[in-house]
Amino acid sequence: MAAKVFTQNPIYSQSLVRDKTPQQKHNLDHFSISQHTSKRLVVSSSTMSPPISSSPLSLPSSSSSQAIPPSRAPAVTLPLSRVWREIQGSNNWENLIEPLSPILQQEITRYGNLLSASYKGFDLNPNSKRYLSCKYGKKNLLKESGIHDPDGYQVTKYIYATPDINLNPIKNEPNRARWIGYVAVSSDESVKRLGRRDILVTFRGTVTNHEWLANLKSSLTPARLDPHNPRPDVKVESGFLGLYTSGESESKFGLESCREQLLSEISRLMNKHKGEEISITLAGHSMGSSLAQLLAYDIAELGMNQRRDEKPVPVTVFSFAGPRVGNLGFKKRCEELGVKVLRITNVNDPITKLPGFLFNENFRSLGGVYELPWSCSCYTHVGVELTLDFFDVQNISCVHDLETYITLVNRPRCSKLAVNEDNFGGEFLNRTSELMFSKGRRQALHFTNAATNAAYLLCSISNHMLYYNIF
């Protein structure tokens, strides 16, 4: 194992999981960082000491609405406009992950920031007229969310989804359709820098009670999104599929399902910009990354990205902390259709191990040769993985937080640190005990903070376990 060599890191804003108590919003301080040998960004933290506001290693509170700025990477030979197809995964990100390409790093950060607006704009105040919708109008969403260069994209449509549940509406939540993200298109000025017209769709993760209740529905079911060729062997998680395809007749947003809203708007934008170089980029966090993958598959399966006498429009998913979506048939079909998925994951994030905690792509064959009978029923990840490694004993819930992901992708990397990828549970416990019981770090107050945050994360994990029926 290589020796740990750490450097100080610049200050970045930190936003932890939303809707926590002030005690759970404890800052991550004294972070150290190194790079793992296998596409992994490794962070070690010593956060049991009291937070020092003046420390250059302290991360400020998430109260700031400013997005995390792109990394000041070294100058590159080619501009994005020349290599955008490779950045969108045309070669499956070969030679771009290890080491991480500065341009790819910049684009992951940019899409992550644009995705964060789906959280910052979501209104969870029951007394608000915009409850469960977006707090801002389409013209102001990116600016009000603190997005760098808010004029780079024009938001064209808000997307609403209805959890597919046969339960009476929860009190104070009369409207079951919720705002889950938006569709945007790059501006004329941005086209020059990007090298193409980029159609962007973002999806936030699970927030409301109805969405958690929808999580109780879980099994693999045929997607059947193409009426002319149902492909019963292509199966996806039923809860995600229900959220994607169900509508709400009593919703003020109309009868359209999330799927119908999206396909209609994407088709409109592609017709509007016919003749231009176009890309379709889908960015999602947690549950939202699953919807992004379903939409990407849907677009490609229906042939919406095909153009006569021209190259197909690239369809790319940037998945942050995403769970598995479907079975091996779904994975193979996505690959056949040319759908590209870059999964940004944290080795310490349990959600990325679900569904299929036990029966997954690692349990489909015997010795990597003989396919086992149940392989078609195993959940399987799609795409290429960029693995991060971060953990904070006082803010355990941060292992799944979007802005923590963005911050760590955007940090400079230094020396290497080997980590056993297959020992998730042991690694988690070892880091916890090491940080909690190291010399001089036994203050009761910080132990209480750690316990509170651990309970918060475990509650979230248990909900996901119910969702994914992992047992």
From Swiss-Prot:
Coarse class of the protein's main subcellular location: plastid
Transit peptide: 1-88
UniProt EC number: 3.1.1.26, 3.1.1.32
Region (Disordered): 44-71
Keyword Ion transport (UniProt): no
Transmembrane segments: none
Physiological role: Sn-1-specific phospholipase that releases free fatty acids from phosphatidylcholine. Has a higher galactolipase activity than phospholipase A1 activity when digalactosyldiacylglycerol (DGDG) is used as substrate. Catalyzes the initial step of jasmonic acid biosynthesis. Required for the biosynthesis of basal-level endogenous jasmonate in vegetative tissues. Regulates leaves growth. Not essential for jasmonate biosynthesis after wounding or upon pathogen infection.
Name of the protein in question: Galactolipase DONGLE, chloroplastic
